[in-house]
Amino acid sequence: MSYEVQWHGYEGNEKVIKKHGIFNTLNEAQNSVREWWKKNNFEPYYIRQCMLEDGTCWWDYGSYVCFYYFVPKGE
């Protein structure tokens, strides 16, 4: 199953969703975020992962208002 990486956050007072691509597996999708963090010298204090009933995985990475969503795109 492929997964779309989405970043949910705020720019000013406006909620935004930025899509960062579709990957073949959940692991590849999550690694794409880790690689971006490494490239940009960012290290989260923690990653809290939650799985939703629809198969979406989301990461809380300590920013309080920004999250990564890994959305399943079908078989």
PLM regions and their residue ranges:
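Intrinsically disordered, low-complexity regions enriched in Ser/Pro/Gly/Gln/His and often acidic
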Residues: 1, 29-30, 48-52
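Short aromatic-glycine-(Arg/Gly/Cys) micro-motifs in beta-strand/loop hairpins
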Residues: 1-17, 47, 60-61
